[in-house]
Regions:
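Long, contiguous amphipathic alpha-helices that act as assembly "spine/axial" helices in icosahedral shell
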Residues: 124-197, 357-361
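Surface-exposed interfaces of beta-sheet-rich extracellular modules
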Residues: 408-434
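Small-residue (G/S/T/A) turn/hinge positions that recur once per unit in extracellular repeat modules
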Residues: 393-402, 429
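Conserved "repeat-terminator" motif of extracellular CCP/Sushi domains
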Residues: 383-390, 436-458
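Assembly/oligomerization interface modules of large self-assembling protein complexes
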Residues: 51-140
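Short coil/turn motif common to extracellular beta-sandwich-like domains
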Residues: 384, 403-410
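Extended oligomerization regions of viral-like shell subunits
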Residues: 213-335
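Extended, compositionally biased alpha-helical segments that mediate assembly or anchoring
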Residues: 1-61, 65, 283-383
Length: 458
């Protein structure tokens, strides 16, 4: 962290005043230069008090400077915003019911007064995924002799302060970045775990009968245009009331000003290069909460695409551990995920025997994911094949034979005369029943064999 000369003078002057207290007000010595300040401290043997005062003063100054930095990710919230995030209550939209105002029993007779206590709509309370909760702490030790030598000249004092707090501030920013990344990655894992994700590469290859790989897709203008269009279309669709874009199946919508678009930098660079002024891409980058992200969880040594686009998340509230590569974009309501890293405070302990001062800093940290809010993951991955096992006493057909996450395949069953469908499953998992002859399979990116079993009518 860099300070200018005027900042250094103000910081040190205020710190000396704090260290000397009432004694300082009784002196008339000049305190406009560092040498005089050093003499003042020496006269009152107040180096230890000065160090503590200096630490607190710098912390206050850092807070003031940090106010103008802003967050690099919209996920990071202050204490009040985070408190509001984790205390949300959701109201489920009630179904329309017949109102008895104008009703007459059986169409004849007198009006019957309806009871005001027959309303049965309930309030739904959200359940959040919490993680990363705890206290961040870092400690450093500085010899008191360093304080004395820092008063030789302004540059020495600047070096002293920078050396004292640069490591602390870097650690603070790194931890802030890590808790933010962990929050976003857990939110993506939750969406992937719930099937709220789209494999754009598999979709493109299936739709246009292509065989692009992840590598060739990133240099294909046609694919990049398709991907940008689909992401942009999802952003617009999320503006309509729907349950399609959140894991909890909650009826909600996301307006453009509340939409966060987090784009992997390598994919964003590819679209910039190959699409240039393409309308779909420009509409995405123009959104108020558009953010470029160099990597989701790790950069690796070379910032290669496979590493930067991957997440590997384990959380007790997820049904499965989630490991996914090729993630290029995460669009979500600003209420989907929040991280907090604040309530920062400092402390000092003087060890007179060793003539050192131990300086420590603490901050509260944590994050939460809300599955009631809209969130969709877009990624590039390979696809699998869906097939039917041999069927006795009937037949069946698939709406698609390509397996990729987000592809809902309809199984149409045709029992032979005198038979009906007993079960339709993949392994031990029964497929969702639509009606007596139609079933839905939510595909993954893996191969799958669907077994249809017919049973004779009784």
């Amino acid at each position: 962290m860099a300070y200018n000369v005027s900042q250094i003078k103000n910081i040190v002057n205020d710190s000396v005043k704090d260290a000397l207290g009432a004694n300082y007000s009784a002196t008339k010595q000049e305190t406009s230069d560092f040498v005089s300040l050093g003499k003042q401290l020496a006269n009152f043997n107040a180096y230890e008090g000065f160090f503590g005062a200096l630490a607190n003063r710098i912390v206050r100054t850092i807070y003031f400077i940090r106010t103008y930095e802003g967050s690099s990710r919209s996920v990071l919230r202050d204490e009040h915003e985070y408190g509001a995030f984790i205390q949300k209550v959701y109201y489920d939209l009630p179904e329309a019911v017949d109102n008895p105002t104008w009703s007459i029993p059986n169409g004849v007779g007198k009006y019957v007064q309806a009871s005001p206590y027959d309303v049965q709509a309930i309030v739904g309370v959200s359940s959040l995924i919490f993680g990363g909760k705890g206290t961040w702490s870092i400690e450093i030790v500085r010899p008191i002799e360093q304080i004395k030598s820092a008063f030789l000249e302004e540059s020495a004092m600047m070096n002293f302060i920078s050396g004292l707090y640069e490591a602390v501030e870097n650690a603070f920013k790194l931890q802030e970045e890590e808790i933010t990344n962990l929050a976003v990655n857990t939110a993506m894992a939750s969406s992937l775990d719930g099937g709220i994700a789209r494999n754009l590469l598999a979709e493109y290859n299936a739709k246009y009968s292509q065989s692009l790989t992840v590598a060739t897709a990133l240099i294909s203008a046609d694919f990049l245009r398709f991907a940008s269009k689909e992401i942009n279309r999802a952003v617009k669709n999320m503006g309509k009331m729907s349950t399609a874009f959140n894991k909890a199946g909650y009826k909600t919508f996301t307006t453009p000003d509340r939409m966060v678009v987090e784009m992997l930098s390598e994919f964003a660079s590819a679209t910039d290069m190959y699409l240039q002024s393409d309308t779909f891409h420009d509409e995405l980058t123009a959104l108020p909460n558009y953010e470029d992200v160099p990597f989701w969880q790790a950069s690796g040594k070379d910032f290669d695409f496979n590493t930067c686009s991957s997440i590997n998340i384990e959380h007790d509230d997820l049904d499965n551990d989630v490991s996914q590569s090729g993630i290029i974009c995460f669009i979500h309501d600003i209420e989907n995920v929040a991280a907090y890293f604040g309530n920062r405070r400092a402390w000092e302990i003087v060890n007179p025997r060793s003539e050192v001062v131990v300086h420590g800093e603490k901050a509260e940290k944590g994050f939460a994911v809300d599955d009631h809010a809209n969130a969709v993951v877009f990624y590039l991955g390979s696809s699998g094949t869906v097939s039917l096992a041999e069927i006795e006493h009937g037949s069946a057909s698939l709406s698609s034979s390509v397996a990729y996450r987000g592809n809902n395949i309809i199984v149409t069953c045709t029992p032979a005369s005198g038979y009906h469908v007993k079960s339709v499953n993949v392994g031990d998992v029964d497929l969702e029943k639509i009606d007596n002859t139609h079933y839905a399979y939510k595909a993954t990116d893996s191969n799958a064999t669907i077994t249809v079993t017919m049973e004779a009518n009784s």
